Curated annotation (Swiss-Prot):
The gene is vif. The lineage of its organism: Viruses, Riboviria, Pararnavirae, Artverviricota, Revtraviricetes. A motif (HCCH motif) lies at residues 108-139. Keywords: AIDS, Host cell membrane, Host cytoplasm, Host membrane, Host-virus interaction, Membrane, Metal-binding, Phosphoprotein, RNA-binding, Ubl conjugation, Ubl conjugation pathway, Virion, Zinc. It comes from Human immunodeficiency virus type 1 group M subtype K (isolate 96CM-MP535) (HIV-1). Residues 14-17, 74-79 are annotated as: Interaction with host APOBEC3F. Residues 75-114 are annotated as: RNA-binding. This is Virion infectivity factor.
Length: 192
């Protein structure tokens, strides 16, 4: 019988970013308790040798699984040292891969306080509204003028530590042009 291959999207991520993601997840699971229904699965609990960890995030009947890998083939850049992340949405026996933006939106629907579009209606009706959104990564569009006015009224406060964002985890920060720092006029630092 011939080999059957299954292809899946794995986002190449550097090791330090994966470690930051894991520590943020553990913080919000155990200390802030905002993600206390999440399940962190260690590498020794998996039978697959390339899986570094899994984070199972319940979303109603479904769940989102963020899997980190190690020991993969290196990428085209020197810093792609065989680390990667895949994001999967599961409902019973159905599984599909999702993009980081959608994963953040799904997480934001179920977890972390939000000052959302519904806050405009609640404020007009005189109801108490949540003063801020803890998960800005879950919003991908500009709000209405009323929403922007309400958010301007309430000063945003950044949660410490920040909410774990899947989009931030797989963000490609290496291909952005970086400025070198050094002494003024240094020939070696200016690239001349």
């Amino acid at each position: 019988m011939e080999n059957r291959w299954q292809v899946m999207i794995v986002w190449q991520v550097d090791r330090m970013r994966i470690n930051t993601w894991k520590s943020l997840v553990k913080y919000h699971m155990h200390i802030s308790k905002k993600a206390n229904r999440w399940y962190y699965r260690h590498h020794y609990e998996s039978r697959h040798p390339k899986i570094s960890s899994e984070v199972h995030i319940p979303l109603g009947d479904a769940e989102l699984v963020v899997t980190t890998y190690w020991g993969l083939l290196t990428g085209e850049r020197d810093w792609h040292l065989g680390q990667g992340v895949s994001i999967e949405w599961r409902l019973k026996r159905y599984r599909t891969q999702v993009e980081p933006d959608l994963a953040d939106q799904l997480i934001h629907i179920y977890y972390f306080d939000c000052f959302s579009e519904s806050a405009v209606r609640k404020a007009i009706l005189g109801h108490r509204v949540s003063p801020r959104c803890e998960c800005q990564a879950g919003h991908n569009k500009v709000g209405s003028l009323q929403y922007l006015a309400l958010t301007a009224l309430v000063a945003p406060r950044r949660p410490k530590p920040p909410v774990p964002s899947v989009k931030k985890l797989v963000e490609d920060r290496w291909n952005k042009p970086q400025k070198t720092r050094g002494h003024r006029g240094s020939q070696t630092m200016n690239g001349h």
